[in-house]
């Protein structure tokens, strides 16, 4: 790699701002855009004008739905070095976890924003775990330090206790709640106060005397934490030497990139305090594309290839989001891991096995855009002109060996609704609109019942589907009626069986013949479907194995109990027979389907239901009512935890029992409780209930 390319990549940061729904994430992103000069006036979420929240509904609801990728420039304070920071705004609402998943997949580092008065909330925990899964280094920002009940210590302790991570506070607040007036940098031992409301005039001075002891104590702890992850610093520490600022920053950077420690900062985005220091910390501690491990791809014969970040290397890019844009049509957001993507060139979509032409390339600002001729390794941008690329698809150079990059985990939908247009004339328009929305969002599924012709949509929660029905109305001008929410059950088998499927049709001339023998066995919950080909001696020829598997998979889409998909089982195709003339792919597909249907019938089928992890934050005096009510909903109480003067009740409750819970909870507690709910796992429905459901 040339020195120029290296220097260019060193000055790059791809980060996400990840947080709980009201921790102030969009406001923090807004401030970053304001101070980096990308927006000339500050957009406030609570007056509906935020730049990042650019879908109409997001502005109305004050929540962020779609992760928009924005490019900003920042000069590190006290230096002349300019950095490019790509920010991916991620939604904090649990119904949109796929958006968080996709963004985690393409980020190099993240800023986790916490509400200082609330500490680590349930959704923050979910987002943190996703970042753990994708190995994303993080710095934490204790926001809302000016709010009543704000406590920097609460955030630091919660990171340690609730997240099991090692926090490394690199700042300390001067005052809390309405006394919050500035920030002390523990690394450089300087204090910063703000002299105007916009936060653009910052005064730097010595640490005030009343904070001297606290700062000395916390700085000693910080050096100790850094020494744990850096051997050179450990030697100095043991010999009682004081490290220089540069040595301390280097050690903290190393520890952060290795995900061993997590620097913690503080501020108030709404009051414009601490955001510039946060940007400096993004530059100081979060990785550039050169600091993260090279992305790995797998060839068709299982060989693993590494793609280091190098603009002159072979092209490897991941499509992480599809959006329909009213002006230019379909936008495919991509992260370039290696090589350079040129406008007007051809690429090979390895996931779909298709050659595609790249039209124009755009770099996005929250809702304006800049056209570019190329996107290089380490960059994020949007492509116009790709017709087939979907979320998680791998794009490589035209003519290169087929390689697949690790894709994105797509959770299964847990809730479904029947939907129909208010007027018959809109039927076709509704079909097109739903199909386009499903292309953008892989957790949204559209199905039409073959017998009744009824269309159902399924997704990750009530809010998720409500927003998609709303988009159908706004963007595709289709008014739709929706039914009551239904639970997306699953079916499975509970005992192993051995069955065969034989399809024989003799009707003058060429007949049809397909015959397979399969073993079906239950797997543990969440294991999905596993197919094994154990045919020996060619009793089922190789070319018929694929069609038989396809028949099996298609038959699994509708189980015998209530017609829900069959999951968590392993099918082994071990024998069968064929006919030289009459056998065909179609015959084996039907035989596979017949065998599977019989296997599920004989395998003591059971119904599975989604179980949600519910956390209710409730004042002490209503706790008994809340627990009694959750028990009556077949809930299993997992524990309680005191938080301030409230209690957090944690429970597992079946989704079918949680519809309309918000209203009941409010009336039980006079509106003083709040709750959050996430899908956790599937579990078997008790027999008596399964019987009732089947009678309906």
UniProtKB/Swiss-Prot annotation:
Gene3D superfamilies xref list: 3.30.230.10, 3.30.70.240, Elongation Factor G (Translational Gtpase), domain 3 (3.30.70.870), P-loop containing nucleotide triphosphate hydrolases (3.40.50.300), Translation factors (2.40.30.10)
Molecular function in Gene Ontology: GTP binding; GTPase activity; translation elongation factor activity
A Gene Ontology biological process term: ribosome disassembly
Primary subcellular site in the record, as a coarse category: cytoplasm
PROSITE patterns in the record: G_TR_1, G_TR_2
Chain positions recorded as GTP binding sites: 19-26, 89-93, 143-146
InterPro entries for this protein: EFG_II, EFG_III, EFG_III/V, EFG_IV, EFG_V, EFG_V-like, EFTu-like_2, G_TR_CS
Keyword Phosphoprotein appears in the UniProt entry: no
Domain (tr-type G) ranges: 10-290
Location within or outside the cell: Cytoplasm
Keyword annotations: Cytoplasm, Elongation factor, GTP-binding, Nucleotide-binding, Protein biosynthesis
Record's GO cellular component terms: cytoplasm
Annotated function: Catalyzes the GTP-dependent ribosomal translocation step during translation elongation. During this step, the ribosome changes from the pre-translocational (PRE) to the post-translocational (POST) state as the newly formed A-site-bound peptidyl-tRNA and P-site-bound deacylated tRNA move to the P and E sites, respectively. Catalyzes the coordinated movement of the two tRNA molecules, the mRNA and conformational changes in the ribosome.
Family: Belongs to the TRAFAC class translation factor GTPase superfamily. Classic translation factor GTPase family. EF-G/EF-2 subfamily.
PANTHER family cross-referenced by the UniProt entry: RIBOSOME-RELEASING FACTOR 2, MITOCHONDRIAL (PTHR43261:SF1), TRANSLATION ELONGATION FACTOR G-RELATED (PTHR43261)
Name assigned to this protein: Elongation factor G
Organism expressing this protein natively: Deinococcus geothermalis (strain DSM 11300 / CIP 105573 / AG-3a)
């Amino acid at each position: 790699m040339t020195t120029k390319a290296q220097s260019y990549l060193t000055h790059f940061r791809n980060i996400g701002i990840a947080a709980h729904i009201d921790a102030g994430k969009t406001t923090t992103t807004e401030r970053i855009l304001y101070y980096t000069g990308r927006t000339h006036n500050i957009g406030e979420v609570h007056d509906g004008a935020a730049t990042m929240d650019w879908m109409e509904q997001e502005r109305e609801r004050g929540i962020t739905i779609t992760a928009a990728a924005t490019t900003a420039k920042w000069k590190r304070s006290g230096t002349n070095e300019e950095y490019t920071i790509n920010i991916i705004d991620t939604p904090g609402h649990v119904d949109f976890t796929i958006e968080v998943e996709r963004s985690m997949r393409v980020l190099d580092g993240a800023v986790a924003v916490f509400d200082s008065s609330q500490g680590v909330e349930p959704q923050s925990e979910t987002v943190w775990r996703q970042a753990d899964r994708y190995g994303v280094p993080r710095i934490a920002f204790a926001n809302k330090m000016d709010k009543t009940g704000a406590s920097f210590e609460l955030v630091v302790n919660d990171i340690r206790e609730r997240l099991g991570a090692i926090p490394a506070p690199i700042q300390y607040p001067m005052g809390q709640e309405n006394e919050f007036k500035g920030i002390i940098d523990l690394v450089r031992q300087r204090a910063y106060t703000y002299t105007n409301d916009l936060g653009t005039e910052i005064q730097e001075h010595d640490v005030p005397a009343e904070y001297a002891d606290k700062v000395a104590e916390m700085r000693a702890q910080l050096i100790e934490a850094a020494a744990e992850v850096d051997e050179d610093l450990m030697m100095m520490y043991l010999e009682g030497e004081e490290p220089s600022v540069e040595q301390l920053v280097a050690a903290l950077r190393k520890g952060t990139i290795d995900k061993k420690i997590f620097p913690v900062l503080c501020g108030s985005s709404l009051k414009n305090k601490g955001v510039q220091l946060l940007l400096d910390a993004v530059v100081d501690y979060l990785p550039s594309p050169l600091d993260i491990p090279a992305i790995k791809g797998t060839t068709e014969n299982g060989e693993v290839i590494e793609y280091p970040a190098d603009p002159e290397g072979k092209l490897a890019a991941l499509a992480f989001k599809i959006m329909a844009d009213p002006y230019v049509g379909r936008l495919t957001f991509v992260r370039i891991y290696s090589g350079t993507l040129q406008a007007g060139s051809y690429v090979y979509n390895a996931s779909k096995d298709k050659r595609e032409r790249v039209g124009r390339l755009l770099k996005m600002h929250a809702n304006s855009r800049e056209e570019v001729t190329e996107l290089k390794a380490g960059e994020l941008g949007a492509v116009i002109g790709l017709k087939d690329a979907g979320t998680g698809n791998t794009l490589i150079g035209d003519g290169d060996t087929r390689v697949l990059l690790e894709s994105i985990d797509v959770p299964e939908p847990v809730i479904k609704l029947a939907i129909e247009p208010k007027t018959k004339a809109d039927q076709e328009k509704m079909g097109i609109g739903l199909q386009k929305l499903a292309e953008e969002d892989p957790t949204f599924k559209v199905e039409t019942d073959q017998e009744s012709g009824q269309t159902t949509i399924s997704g990750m929660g009530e809010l998720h589907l409500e927003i998609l029905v709303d988009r159908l109305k706004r963007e595709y001008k289709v008014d739709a009626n929706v039914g009551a929410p239904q639970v997306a059950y699953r079916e499975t088998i509970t005992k192993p069986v051995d069955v065969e499927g034989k399809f024989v049709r003799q009707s003058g001339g060429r007949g049809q013949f397909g015959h397979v023998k399969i073993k079906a066995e239950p797997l543990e919950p969440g294991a999905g479907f596993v197919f094994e080909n154990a045919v020996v001696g060619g009793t089922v020829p190789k070319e018929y194995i694929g069609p038989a598997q396809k028949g099996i998979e298609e038959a699994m889409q509708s189980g015998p109990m209530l017609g829900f998909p069959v999951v968590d089982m392993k099918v082994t195709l071990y024998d069968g027979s064929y006919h030289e003339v009459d056998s065909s792919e179609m015959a084996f597909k039907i035989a596979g389907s017949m065998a599977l249907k019989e296997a599920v019938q004989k395998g003591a089928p059971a119904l599975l239901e989604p179980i949600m992890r519910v956390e209710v934050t409730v004042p002490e005096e209503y706790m008994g009512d809340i627990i009694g009510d959750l028990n009556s909903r077949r809930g299993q109480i997992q524990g309680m935890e005191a938080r301030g003067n409230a209690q957090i009740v944690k429970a597992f409750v079946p989704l079918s029992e949680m519809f309309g819970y918000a209203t009941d909870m409010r009336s039980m507690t006079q509106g003083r409780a709040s709750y959050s709910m996430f899908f956790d796992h599937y579990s078997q429905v008790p027999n008596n209930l399964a019987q009732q459901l089947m009678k309906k």
